[in-house]
Amino acid sequence: MKIGPYKEEEAFLSPRIVIFHDVASEGDIEMIKTRSTPRFKRATVQNYKTGDLETATYRISKTAWLKPEEDIRISNIYRRVASVTRLNMETSEELQVSNYGIGGHYEPHFDFARREEKNAFASLGTGNRIATWLFYVSRRFIYSKIDSQGFFRKNVL
């Protein structure tokens, strides 16, 4: 693990998968959750043949999109990701916030367009994806036994 402005942990060598710690604060995450929750809609995927967005049984989640110009904190997150990855964020997509909830899932898939998906990102004007950045946020549950009758659950971040 490297120590710097952000902690870097190499999780896998090939393909290279890196975990960066402390890029988003708890305050950043709370702001993202507050802004995205009222916007959540059933997630869609792009049909590679038609280019249309549609729901799919292999992706069960709710999704919202946040623009960097909506809040200086979102803009700062983009800046930090650019700093860590050394990638230009000008052609990146909006910040996608997904909630998989109970029973939600996304089956294995590609985040880049394959050869047969010639116009996958045409409407965005961004070109193909070269990297995917994920902030993984989950609630942890602590169960405390109460009089041998059941369990008590506390939400802890």
Residue ranges and their predicted role:
Residues 1-157:
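Fe(II)/2-oxoglutarate oxygenase catalytic core
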